[in-house]
Amino acid sequence: MTRGAAAAAGVAASAGIAGLAHYLTVTGRVTLDTGWGRRVRPLGPFTIEVAAPPPVVFDVIAAPYLGRTPRAMAGKLRVVERRGDMVLAEHYTPVHGGRLTAATLETVAFDRPHRIGFRLVRGPVPHVAEEFRLTGQGAATIIEYTGELGTDFGIAGQWWATRVAAAWEAAVRHSFDGIKAEAERRSSPGRQ
């Protein structure tokens, strides 16, 4: 093999390894959790007002986890194990324009009717902790979302965190739209 051919083969192999590493990281199949140069950034905060009382909103959020997961959510959620008010669940989120699916494994803890907490076990970053706080306001509920996302490897990890956080927050906002619609449907006067 000539020197040029060897260099080309080395570049091709490096590109292949980098592509595989990117795929495994993005999809959550491999989590790099070294703690080296760990940086933590906030997720949120943001809020949404739902025209339904906190117990109804809580039940809408908790039902797919604590009860039977609806068939319509099968492509988004799989509960691995249930134990009282805590579950271990996989969440699936389309990324890269739907070409890939990011999978996260998270514990989800329920404190009826005011708090749902999420903690990442495995995913595209080594650390995520987040919560939904439900506060009654008249006949409505304010859902407040807060959290934090941590990555390793200093500036490189910070760059990755910016990309992951944008997709993460977009997924939460999208889920809030569904929560709002279903909770308000359940609380509509025609349902009483």
Describe every region a protein language model picked out.
Residues 52-54, 111, 137-139:
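Short loop segments at secondary-structure junctions
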Residues 31-34, 80-82, 105-109, 151-155:
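Short amphipathic alpha-helical segments, especially helix-boundary/capping motifs
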Residues 115-162, 167-171:
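Non-cytosolic head/periplasmic domains of membrane-anchored proteins
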Residues 3, 20-27, 148-192:
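A conserved amphipathic terminal alpha-helix motif
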Residues 6, 10-85:
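Hydrophobic ligand-binding cavity/cleft-lining segments
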Residues 4, 49, 65-71, 75-124, ...:
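Glycine-rich portal/gate segments that line the openings of hydrophobic small-molecule binding cavities
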Residues 30-32, 39-40, 89, 100, ...:
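Generic, low-specificity signal for short hydrophobic/alpha-helical stretches with a mild N-terminal bias
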